[in-house]
C-alpha cells in the first residue's frame, strides 16, 4: 500500500565542514572544561582555538592587513593632494574618475574577459551600475555639506556609526541574522570610539554644528545602500569585479558634475566658488595639476578665504593617490564579493586608529606628523577586542547553520527510509 510517494533526491549528505570537525576535536567535554581544570590547560585550549581560527582563515587576515596598508596610504595621499591642489576639487575628482575608468577597463579587457562567462558578457547591468554611481554621488554630496561644520573628532566617530547603520539595513533588506556576540562586538567598537573622541573634542576649538553632524550621519545611508547593491550584484549575478568598477567609474564622471552647484554654497569657506568663476577655476586647476603653475599665491593660507597653491610636483602626489585609491576600490569590491557588506564595514573601521598611528611617522605623514597619544592605542585595542567578539558571533552562527543543515538531511533520510518501508 502506497501512503506517501516523494521523489527521492538520492543519497545527498551534507558533509560537515572540516574546519569545525577539527575544531570540535580540539574541544574537550564541556563538563571537563567547566570543572576545575588547571588554568594552564584552559589557556592551552583557547590558544588552540585561536591557532585553528587563524590557520583556517589566513587568507582573510592577510587581506585585512593588505587593505589596512592600502587604506592608510590612500588617506595620507588624499590629504597631501588636498594640501597641494585643494582649490581645484572638481578637476581632481574628474581626472581621478577618468584614470580609474581607463585603468579598470584596460585590466578588464586584458584579464577579466578571459574568466567572464558568455552569459555575463552579453547581459546588461547598466541600471545596477547607474544606481551604484548615483548612491555614491549622493553620499559624497551629503558628506561634502556635513563636513563643513563637523570637527575632526566627530568625523571619526560618525564614520564608526556605519557599523550599526549597515547592520540595520542588512538585517532589513538582505535578511542578515546576527548573534548576541555580533551586537556586543559592534557596540564595543562604537562605544570605544565615542568615548575617546568625546575626550579629544575638548582639546579642539573648531567650529561644530549638530545640524551638520546629522547631515554627515545621513550620508552613511546611501553609502550603505551602495555597498548592499554591490553585494547583490556580486552574489546574484556573479559579475566581474573589474567590469563593475570600470562602468561605475564611467558613470561617476557624469555624476560628479552634480557636485558643481555645491561649490557655490556660501558656508563652504575656503572651497566656496562663485558660479561665474567655475570655468576659470577648472582652467587653473589643469594648469596646476599638469603644468605645476601656481595661481592663488596672495591673500591665502590658514584662516584666509582661500588655500595657497603648491602645484610643484602635484601630479606625482595625485598619481600616487589615484594608485592607492584604485587598489582600495579593488580590495573593497573583493571583500564584499567573497564575504559580505558587514565584513567590509567591520574591517574598514580599523582605518581610523591605524591612520592616526600612521601620522606618527614623518616619512608617511610629512609635515603633518603628530606626537604619539595613548588614546590612539586605546582606540586600536577597543577595535581589535570588539572585532574578535564580533568574529566569535560569526563562528557560532556558521556552526549552528551547519548543524541545522545536517539535522535536516538526517530527517530527510529517515523520511525516505520510512517511505521505502511503507511502499514495499
UniProtKB/Swiss-Prot annotation:
Location within or outside the cell: Vacuole membrane
TM spans (from-to): 58-78, 90-110, 125-145, 154-174, 180-200, 209-229, 247-267, 317-337, 346-366, 377-397
Alphabetical list of InterPro entries matching this protein: CRT-like, Transprt_Chloroquine
The organism's place on the tree of life at top rank: Eukaryota
Primary location: membrane
Entry GO CC: vacuolar membrane
Membrane topology (UniProt): Multi-pass membrane protein
GO biological process, one term: amino acid transport
Residues of this chain annotated as glycosylated in UniProt: 87
UniProt feature coiled coil, ranges: none
Sequence ranges on the Vacuolar membrane side: 79-89, 146-153, 201-208, 268-316, 367-376
Residue ranges, Cytoplasmic side: 1-57, 111-124, 175-179, 230-246, 338-345, 398-424
Disulphide bond pairs: 288-311, 300-308
Entry's Gene Ontology molecular function annotations: xenobiotic transmembrane transporter activity
Keywords: Amino-acid transport, Disulfide bond, Glycoprotein, Membrane, Transmembrane, Transmembrane helix, Transport, Vacuole
Protein family per UniProt: Belongs to the CRT-like transporter family.
Function: Nutrient transporter. Involved in maintaining the osmotic homeostasis of the digestive vacuole.
Name of the protein: Putative chloroquine resistance transporter
Taxonomic source organism: Plasmodium knowlesi
Lineage start: Eukaryota, Sar, Alveolata, Apicomplexa, Aconoidasida
Designated gene of the protein: CRT
